[in-house]
Regions:
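Extracellular low-complexity, Gly/Ser/Thr-rich intrinsically disordered linkers
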Residues: 304-401
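Short glycine/threonine-rich turn/loop motifs
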Residues: 30-135, 202-343
Length: 401
């Protein structure tokens, strides 16, 4: 079976249950698919919109989904200075990872291993959620996010929300008497909102308009695109395909796989004060089903590069505050490791310092531009790095000619 066919089936595997549930919903005069005039969304998606922006659903009453997923930043975190906004009951509990963009997740397949054993798909940095519905459960109960003590606590807040009556009308008058069902329906509503609202997948960047023949890229942007695509230069398109799909669909700039890049440790993450703590992505600590796969330790999901110019800081740990820094790291990590990693007492560079030594072998050192050593020239010059960064800026949604 082709990779494209496999991905299509995987995507359908988590969209089909949603369609069945939506068909079954409707406790009042309006069904789940009825469009609400004020939003253009179905009733269930409009409820999801309200849940997404509702700070009263958190223990602090100051955090909502939108707090870490700002539409002006590709539905990622808004601050380049904070890895993730502090949460918890007092809004002082530090997080562990940079909040990823929620844009363009509608076509992400559920997690699977392909025919060659490559981990692919799934949501979040480690792919542990197979759908937007599943992913939505974590922030409500996470101690460093919305920090509800348990599922009934979330539902108790839903019961008194301003849209509670709409929730009852859609899901049944007694829905809040069953916390499991009510919490699940809230997650279904959040998923429906993210699938329906165009702001999560507008395809209106300058690059999209370039592909449609409506605008031209500048000479420098075209040079950056060529460097981005070239296997001998940036080789970015190897994991972030830039061409239309075989069916003419616009590129998502991710192949949904995972990679271990050996990103430097970020001292701004409070947990990193403990030298024994490591975020190992696919094999833990937040995902546990692959804990025995030592070969996957340190691998994180390849993100879409759409809106990358407005989603700083970069990488799973938010180590780099600017896009130029992030691109420079890719092409200079192996030729100039002293620029990125600390030195030991004897002056040697402690490369891959955010991984235990036994997992250093997992870091990608074979593909371009990583397949170089100190003393060799980087795959991209400083000027070429600037050109790639200029091209990446064309992937920001909302372009106005």
């Amino acid at each position: 079976m082709s990779t494209a066919r496999t991905l299509l089936l995987r995507r359908a595997s988590w969209l089909a249950p949603l369609a069945l549930l939506l068909a079954a919903c409707g406790g009042g005069s309006e069904g789940a698919s009825t469009t609400t005039p004020s939003t253009g969304l179905s009733v269930i998606a409009a409820i999801g919109d309200q849940i997404f922006h509702d700070t009263s659903l958190s223990a602090s009453r100051r955090m909502a989904c939108a707090s870490c997923h700002d539409p002006a930043h590709g539905h990622s975190s808004a601050s380049a200075d904070a890895v993730v906004p502090a949460g918890g009951p007092g809004m002082a509990t530090p997080g562990f990872r940079k909040a990823p963009s929620l844009n363009y997740l509608n076509l992400t397949p559920a997690f699977f291993f392909d025919a060659e054993g490559t981990p692919t798909g799934g949501l979040t940095r480690d792919g542990k959620a197979d759908s937007l519905r599943a992913q939505a459960a974590t922030p409500f109960l996470s101690a460093h996010e919305m920090a509800n003590g348990d599922l009934p606590a979330v539902v108790a807040r839903l019961r008194i929300a301003s849209y509670a009556e709409d929730f009852r009308s859609l899901f049944g008058a007694n829905i809040f008497d069953d916390p499991d069902a009510a919490f699940d329906r809230a997650r279904v509503a959040l998923q429906a909102y993210q699938l329906e609202a165009r702001e999560f997948h507008p395809y209106d960047s300058k690059y999209d308009q370039f592909l449609a023949g409506r605008v031209a890229l500048s000479a420098r942007e075209l040079q950056g695109l060529a460097l981005f695509n070239s296997p001998a230069k940036g080789n970015c398109a190897a994991c972030h395909p830039s061409a239309r799909g075989a069916d003419g669909s616009p590129p998502l700039f991710t192949d949904f796989t995972y990679d271990n890049l050996g990103v430097p440790r970020n001292p701004a993450i409070a947990a990193n004060a403990d030298p024994a703590y490591f975020d190992l992505g696919l094999c833990g600590p937040f995902r546990t089903d692959l804990a025995n796969r030592a070969d996957l330790c340190g691998a994180f999901k390849v993100p879409t590069l759409r809106n990358v110019a407005v989603t700083a800081p970069y990488f799973h740990n938010g180590r780099f505050k600017t896009l130029k820094e992030a691109v420079s790291f890719y092409v200079r990590r192996d030729t100039h490791p002293e620029e990125w990693y600390p030195r030991t007492a004897d002056g040697s560079v402690r490369k891959f310092d955010d991984l235990p030594p036994q997992y250093h072998r997992n870091v990608n050192t074979t593909e371009a531009p990583y397949n170089r050593t100190p003393g060799q020239a980087p795959a991209l010059s400083a000027e070429e790095i600037d050109l790639v960064v200029e091209f990446l800026a064309t992937l920001t949604d909302g372009y106005q000619p």
